[in-house]
C-alpha cells in the first residue's frame, strides 16, 4: 500500500513538473522584419508552440551579435539568428550551441543606384549593411572577392535595419545596400536596380537562420528543447507549403499591407527554407573561413561538432516526425 502511495505521489510530482515547464515563459528572439524571419513567427501564430506545450514570447533583437549577447546573458532562451557571432562566441568558450537551421542561404540582393551597372562600379562607393560581424558583412566580402574587387576599395557602413537602409538608398545617402524581400520589391518599384543576388554567389551556403540556445539550458531542459524543435520544424514546413496560412503571418509581422509585395516575399522564401531544419555543414565551414580571415590572430577550432548539436533533431527523425509533418509516413 505504501509503495502504491509513493507511486501516486511520484506521478503527481511529475505531472506538476511538466505543467511548470509548460507554463514557464520562454523568450525567443528573432533578428528583424525581413521575410526570412518567418519560421519563428509561424511557430507562434499557427499555435504550434502551444500545441507542444510551450508558453513563448517573441522578441525582436536586431543583429546576430546582440542576439548572441542576449542568449549569453540569459535574457532569452532561444534565438533565431545568423551563425557568425555565434561561431565566434562559441570558439571563445561561450556556453552556446546551434541546434537547428531553417535557412542555409544568403537571402539578400545588392540593390544599387541607377549609375551602378556592373560590380566594378562599386569601387569608391558606400554600401550599407545592417552591422559588422554578421551575414551582411560576410556576404559582401564574399561578393567583392568573387568580383575581384579589393575589400578596401569599397566603404561598408553599418546602417541599421532594412527600413533605414532603404530610406538612405532611395534618398541618395547610400550608393548600394543589401536588402531582402519585401524591400527588394519596393526598391524595384522605385526604379532602383538589383546588381546581384547573394544566392547566386559560388559560395552561397551560409547558416543564415539558425536556432541557438545555451548548452547548459539544453542539457538541463532537453524535453523543452525537443518540444521547441517539434514546433519549429512543423512551422517551417507549414509555412513553406501552405500559402493561405503563410500570407497572414507576413501581413502581421512585416507590417506590410500591399498584397503583391507579401506574395512576392512568400514565393521567394518558401522556395529556399530548409526542411528538415538542419544546419548546412558547408555553410558552417564558409562562415568559419570568413571569421578566420577577418581575425587572423584568433585561433579558430574548425570542428563543427564544437558549434552544432543536432542530436535532438536526429531523435525526432528516428521517431518519424519529419515524415509525419510532410505526409510521407
Predicted regions and their residues:
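Bacterial N-terminal signal peptides that target proteins for export
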Residues: 1-8, 21
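Short, glycine-/small- and polar/acidic-enriched structural segments
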Residues: 22-171, 175-181, 194-198, 204-205
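Extracytoplasmic/secreted envelope proteins and their assembly/folding machinery
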Residues: 37, 68, 83-86, 137, ...
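Pocket-lining segment of extracytoplasmic ligand-binding domains
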Residues: 84-85, 163-256
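Secondary-structure end/capping motifs
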Residues: 219-300
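Conserved C-terminal helix/tail region of periplasmic/extracytoplasmic solute-binding proteins
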Residues: 292-329
Amino acid at each position: 500500500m505504501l509503495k502504491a502511495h509513493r507511486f501516486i505521489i511520484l506521478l503527481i510530482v511529475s505531472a506538476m513538473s511538466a505543467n511548470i515547464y509548460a507554463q514557464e515563459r520562454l523568450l525567443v528572439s528573432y533578428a528583424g522584419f525581413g521575410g526570412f524571419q518567418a519560421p519563428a513567427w509561424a511557430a507562434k501564430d499557427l499555435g504550434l508552440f502551444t500545441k507542444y506545450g510551450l508558453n513563448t514570447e517573441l522578441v525582436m533583437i536586431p543583429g546576430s551579435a546582440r542576439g548572441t549577447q542576449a542568449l549569453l546573458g540569459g535574457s532569452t532562451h532561444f534565438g533565431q539568428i545568423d551563425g557568425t557571432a555565434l561561431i565566434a562566441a562559441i570558439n571563445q568558450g561561450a556556453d552556446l550551441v546551434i541546434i537547428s537551421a531553417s535557412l542555409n542561404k544568403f537571402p539578400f540582393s545588392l540593390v544599387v543606384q541607377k549609375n551602378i551597372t556592373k560590380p566594378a562600379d562599386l569601387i569608391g562607393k558606400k554600401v550599407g549593411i545592417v552591422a559588422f560581424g554578421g551575414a551582411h558583412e560576410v556576404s559582401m566580402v564574399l561578393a567583392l572577392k568573387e568580383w575581384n574587387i579589393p575589400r578596401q576599395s569599397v566603404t561598408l557602413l553599418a546602417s541599421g535595419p532594412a527600413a533605414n537602409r532603404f530610406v538612405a538608398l532611395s534618398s541618395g545617402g547610400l550608393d548600394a545596400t543589401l536588402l531582402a524581400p519585401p524591400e527588394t520589391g519596393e526598391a524595384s518599384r522605385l526604379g532602383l536596380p538589383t546588381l546581384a543576388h547573394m544566392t547566386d554567389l559560388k559560395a552561397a551556403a551560409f547558416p543564415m537562420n539558425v536556432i541557438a540556445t545555451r548548452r547548459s539550458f539544453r542539457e538541463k531542459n532537453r524535453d523543452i528543447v525537443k518540444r521547441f524543435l517539434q514546433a519549429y520544424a512543423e512551422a517551417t514546413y507549414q509555412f513553406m507549403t501552405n500559402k493561405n496560412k503563410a500570407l497572414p503571418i507576413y501581413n502581421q509581422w512585416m507590417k506590410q499591407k500591399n498584397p503583391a509585395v507579401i506574395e512576392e516575399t512568400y514565393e521567394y522564401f518558401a522556395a529556399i527554407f530548409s526542411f528538415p531544419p538542419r544546419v548546412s555543414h558547408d555553410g558552417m565551414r564558409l562562415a568559419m573561413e570568413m571569421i578566420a580571415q577577418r581575425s587572423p590572430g584568433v585561433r579558430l577550432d574548425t570542428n563543427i561538432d564544437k558549434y552544432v548539436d543536432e542530436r535532438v533533431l536526429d531523435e525526432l527523425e528516428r521517431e518519424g516526425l519529419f515524415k509525419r509533418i510532410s505526409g510521407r509516413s
